[in-house]
Amino acid sequence: MIIDAVPRYRQIVAEVWRPLLVLFVWDVIVTVTYYVLPFKAPSLPLTLFGSALALFLGFRSTSAYERWWEGRGLWGLMINASRSLSRAARSFLPDEEGRDLQRAIILRQITYVNVLRCQLRKQDPREEALRYLSPDEAAPSLERLNVANGILDGTGRRVDQARQAGWIDTIQQASIERVLIDIANAQGGMERLKNTPLPNQYRFFPEFFARLFCILLPIGLV
């Protein structure tokens, strides 16, 4: 879910001017018809219909906001876990022997986050995967259906290599593994939001009834 910080008014106007023009023409037709052939429409049904529509639209807006808030929380969890992983790599691994591994883990996490961003937006992640990783290092992950998850698995293997080399102990490895689990859980939540959009009924019925209300409104006001 990509939301601009500042509304794009030109884009909004470009999307709504045609329906507004059609409604304006319809309002003129209803008004002219009323003066030529006077009629009286009851206002109570329209009032009840408008109240029900407001509740329906409010419920849909609440559902959409909850999804946005959950996505925001998941991305915040990803940021915090990435910082924790970077801090653990710099704190646990020795500065001399493990400097290259420190850098590799941090660069892999940077690559992972950007590849995940591309996957969620249905963009090709190859360019981001090769930005900080060598072709040989990125190749195993690029061959997988879920490239981001492949990169994360590779990070776990790097941590295990550090334990086998004696640079970290099993307790430190378990601590880093918990951070990787938090990262994987955040990714799973984001993919769930992406792959499970709001049902079509949430989109179709509010739009249909809103259009119907706009058509009936001038009839009830004249």
Residue ranges and their predicted role:
Residues T62, S82-A89:
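N-terminal alpha-helical signal peptides/signal-anchor transmembrane segments
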Residues F24, L53-F56, I181, F209, ...:
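Residue-level signal for the membrane-embedded core of alpha-helical transmembrane segments
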Residues M1-V6, Y132-E137, F204, F208:
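Conserved catalytic-core motifs characterized by acidic clusters
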Residues A88-Y202:
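Structured inter-helical modules in multipass membrane proteins
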Residues M1-N80, D95-R99:
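N-terminal juxtamembrane/topogenic regions of multi-pass membrane proteins
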Residues Y9, V13, V36, P140-R144, ...:
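Solvent-exposed interaction patches of small proteins and small membrane subunits
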Residues E15-L23, E191-V222:
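Transmembrane alpha-helical segments and their cytosolic interface motifs
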